[in-house]
């Protein structure tokens, strides 16, 4: 399907204008006016000095994302983990009892 679309587009290009083609109703579409915004190169970077831009980049690289230690994400979190056993698997009855009542055992797990 992509090859068919490409062939249809190439056939509708006008030989006298390299940046125009026909739309579905047969009218000429001038791509130069449609995409002039994309070809304009004037923006704020031309007006900002190189020293100011370098200072801004350096500040962004050295500023910590979380400046307050209380707002930092802890690396070790207490997470409840359910330990269970199969019935009749040769386990002790005390481990079977703890698996039946569903109480989770809290262990420290390191967050990745």
UniProtKB/Swiss-Prot annotation:
Protein name in UniProt: Cytoplasmic envelopment protein 3
Compartments, as annotated in UniProt: Virion tegument; Virion membrane; Host cell membrane; Host Golgi apparatus membrane
Signal peptide segment: none
GO-annotated biological processes: viral budding from Golgi membrane
Region annotation (Disordered) ranges: 84-112
Alphabetized UniProt keyword annotations: Host cell membrane, Host Golgi apparatus, Host membrane, Lipoprotein, Membrane, Myristate, Palmitate, Phosphoprotein, Virion, Virion tegument
Covalently attached lipid (N-myristoyl glycine), positions: 2
Topology versus the membrane: Lipid-anchor
Similarity-based family: Belongs to the herpesviridae cytoplasmic envelopment protein 3 family.
Main location: virion
Subunit structure: Interacts with cytoplasmic envelopment protein 2; this interaction is essential for the proper localization of each protein to the assembly complex and thus for the production of infectious virus.
Function: Plays an important role in the cytoplasmic envelopment of tegument proteins and capsids during the assembly and egress processes. Also participates in viral entry at the fusion step probably by regulating the core fusion machinery.
PTM annotation: Myristoylation and palmitoylation (probably on one or more of the nearby cysteines at the N-terminus) enable membrane-binding and Golgi apparatus-specific targeting and are essential for efficient packaging.
GO CC term, one of those recorded: host cell Golgi membrane
């Amino acid at each position: 399907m992509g090859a068919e679309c490409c062939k249809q587009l190439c056939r509708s290009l006008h030989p006298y204008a390299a940046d125009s083609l026909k739309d579905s109703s047969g009218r000429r579409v001038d791509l130069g006016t449609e995409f002039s915004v994309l070809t304009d190169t004037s923006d704020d970077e031309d007006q900002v000095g190189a020293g100011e831009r370098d200072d801004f980049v350096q500040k962004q690289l050295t500023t910590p994302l979380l400046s307050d230690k209380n707002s930092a994400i802890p690396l070790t979190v207490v997470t409840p983990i359910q330990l269970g056993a199969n019935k009749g698997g040769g386990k002790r009855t005390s481990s079977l009892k703890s698996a039946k009542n569903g109480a989770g055992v809290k262990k420290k797990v390191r967050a990745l």
